[in-house]
Amino acid sequence: MEETLMHNFQPIIGIEVHVVINSKTKMFSPSANSHRSDPNINVHPIDLGLPGTMPEPNGFVVKKALVLAKALNMQNVDHHLRFDRKNYFYQDLPKGYQITQQHHPIATNGYLDISNKRVPIQRFHIEEDTAKQLNEDNHILLDYNRAGSPLIEIVTDPVFDSGKEVKEYLTNLRRILIFNDISDAKLEEGSMRVDVNVSIRPMGAPNYGTRVEIKNINSINNVEKAINFEISRQQELLLSNKKVVQATMRYDDQLNQTVFMREKTNAIDYRYMFEPNIIGINLDQQFLSEVDQIQVFNIKELESKLLSEGVDQQFVELLLDNFFLYQKINEINQRINDLAFVSKWLLIEFMGRINKQKLQLELINPKWFDNLTDLLVLVKSEDLNQKQAKVVLDEIIKTDETVAEIVDRLKMKQIKDEQEIIALLEPIVLENLAILKDYDQRKERVEKLLIGLLMKKTNGQANPNVSIKVLTDLIQKHR
């Protein structure tokens, strides 16, 4: 059935993404830009549009927008900053209009590559957020902490034809936003919000089908699921000779389906007008030079670098999804100089223990990362073997001791001096001369037996590589 549907219809999908910028203050007021505060604490008269207030654009946000323009390959960047009023009345917008950039977006005509196509980005513009609205016990609760928060809205051409493509685009976009410190891009907290427009048309038809908008999706995985469900829903309607109604839907992750919110009728006339309280601002050369000095991370280049260093693909994906871990792996690697080795220890052994204890990564003891680095130095230098290192790592998370203190307490310091190992191993060889006659036929078995006796004698502290070398010499000496 699904194969037949896909042959008969072409999905057309466009994406609009709103991201809250990592700024200490709001877009046009000095009020704190924080969604974690108690409700209605971070509210300024400018946010409410009280008489006599004058909005002042946040220069930090403008810089972040220009960094994003580089990261998204925007061909046209407007250095003459202008704003418009979007007029409408709703309870989440106390002043009756939103300051945005309808007619003069700061950047147009860019792109972001995914695996099978180049996604054209029509535009992105700066605007202010509205209040957060909560429905509770037949009441509408409003939190104006969010009103006036700085937003960037990013709009693509409708070039996607599957939920899988959209998921890849959003994953890549989110990485760009996080690595370049533009936004923390947390869908579950609302700092990245995705609106999806989905329509289908018979294969080869010239006109688009009726568009349905899906809002309030709380994860990238759910975006993919919502799109796939909506495509199937619209296909089934058309095959049943029913019409697709232009509507706004939401995604219910319990039902795993889109749910009707409201019907869309004619486009609202927002009566856009030039924002009279903010004159056009020319971005001067000094301002632009400061932006040019900001490092812009290219995610594809980072991915290629990690892979070329031997980091497994699964680890690369984890690192590109978590800037904190990416920073930590590079900090640790400054002393280790082996990214593949560090990634396995950080992401499997260390993070395995962190996740098991359900600890919040950003809040764990910074000393643990220093201790992990010291531990890996010992492993690389073969002063500890892998088994010993895992025991030490357990102790790092349990205690406040340094690695040196833990190793000393557990008597794990490896014996690497050849003369010391000769003194320990030669008596073992002399006590077991009878088995040396089998050495040529069963070399591995004989070596394993004698090294095992040495490890038992030293509680595993004899260095394996040095021990094998010494054993080979002793066998030749006493055969």
UniProtKB/Swiss-Prot annotation:
SUPFAM superfamilies: GatB/YqeY motif (SSF89095), Glutamine synthetase/guanido kinase (SSF55931). Keywords: ATP-binding, Ligase, Nucleotide-binding, Protein biosynthesis. It catalyses: L-glutamyl-tRNA(Gln) + L-glutamine + ATP + H2O = L-glutaminyl-tRNA(Gln) + L-glutamate + ADP + phosphate + H(+); L-aspartyl-tRNA(Asn) + L-glutamine + ATP + H2O = L-asparaginyl-tRNA(Asn) + L-glutamate + ADP + phosphate + 2 H(+). GO terms for biological process: glutaminyl-tRNAGln biosynthesis via transamidation; translation. The keyword Ligase applies. Its EC number is 6.3.5.-. It comes from the Bacteria. The keyword Protein biosynthesis applies. One of its GO terms (molecular function) is asparaginyl-tRNA synthase (glutamine-hydrolyzing) activity. InterPro entries: Asn/Gln-tRNA_amidoTrfase_suB/E, Asn/Gln-tRNA_Trfase_suB/E_cat, Asn/Gln_amidotransferase, Asn/Gln_tRNA_amidoTrase-B-like, GatB, GatB_Yqey_C_2, Gln-tRNA_amidoTrfase_suB_CS, Gln_synth/guanido_kin_cat_dom. Belongs to the GatB/GatE family. GatB subfamily. Heterotrimer of A, B and C subunits. Allows the formation of correctly charged Asn-tRNA(Asn) or Gln-tRNA(Gln) through the transamidation of misacylated Asp-tRNA(Asn) or Glu-tRNA(Gln) in organisms which lack either or both of asparaginyl-tRNA or glutaminyl-tRNA synthetases. The reaction takes place in the presence of glutamine and ATP through an activated phospho-Asp-tRNA(Asn) or phospho-Glu-tRNA(Gln). This is Aspartyl/glutamyl-tRNA(Asn/Gln) amidotransferase subunit B. It comes from Mycoplasmoides gallisepticum (strain R(low / passage 15 / clone 2)) (Mycoplasma gallisepticum).
